[in-house]
């Protein structure tokens, strides 16, 4: 995928704020501080498009980014941060459920987990939730530069077993720091567009 343009459309807290242009959407979900904002910036080739916060749990909105004026990448609010109140957790849950259950132009929800660590109970709950709505064929393993390539398979096995992934589901290791794995992720997203006969322009990307 050649990213020619990418911009934030809106940071939404309610369905009435969601874009109404009907463009296909690919959403990213993950724990606070798993590296979602860094991943968004890297795949969209914009260093500061998504704000990278030093304080986990800051993302309280659903952020819609338009890519090449053809589709949206959607950054869902992070979860699993201990210092948020019960009320905030309930608000997060309602926001996520509303988006996942009602968005007709949503074609995939990709879960991000930290490749170094065993997925948490919250990760498992999120993955089951994503699967319930018919998504979850791709999991991104972030911060892949933090372990050796020789350890990948061991960590993939750990992630698959903890999440209960199907054999056909993919794990894509990504390093935002070294910009590794981006082409593979875009290729998998392109496959989703093609499988659904979506009119997305697919061009070979320049090196990330």
UniProtKB/Swiss-Prot annotation:
Residues bound to Mg(2+): 37, 59
GO MF annotations in UniProt: GTP binding; metal ion binding
PANTHER family assigned: ENGB-TYPE G DOMAIN-CONTAINING PROTEIN, MSS1/TRME-RELATED GTP-BINDING PROTEIN
Gene3D superfamilies found in the cross-reference section: P-loop containing nucleotide triphosphate hydrolases (3.40.50.300)
Positions annotated to bind GTP: 30-37, 57-61, 75-78, 142-145, 174-176
UniProt key word Transferase: no
Pfam families on file: MMR_HSR1
UniProt keywords, alphabetically: Cell cycle, Cell division, GTP-binding, Magnesium, Metal-binding, Nucleotide-binding, Septation
Biological processes, Gene Ontology terms: division septum assembly
Annotated function: Necessary for normal cell division and for the maintenance of normal septation.
Domain EngB-type G: 22-195
GO cellular component terms, semicolon-separated: cytosol
Annotated protein name in UniProt: Probable GTP-binding protein EngB
InterPro entries reported in the protein's UniProt record: G_ENGB_dom, GTP-bd, GTP-bd_ribosome_bio_YsxC, P-loop_NTPase, Small_GTP-bd
Record keyword Acetylation present: no
Cofactor: Mg(2+)
Family per similarity comment: Belongs to the TRAFAC class TrmE-Era-EngA-EngB-Septin-like GTPase superfamily. EngB GTPase family.
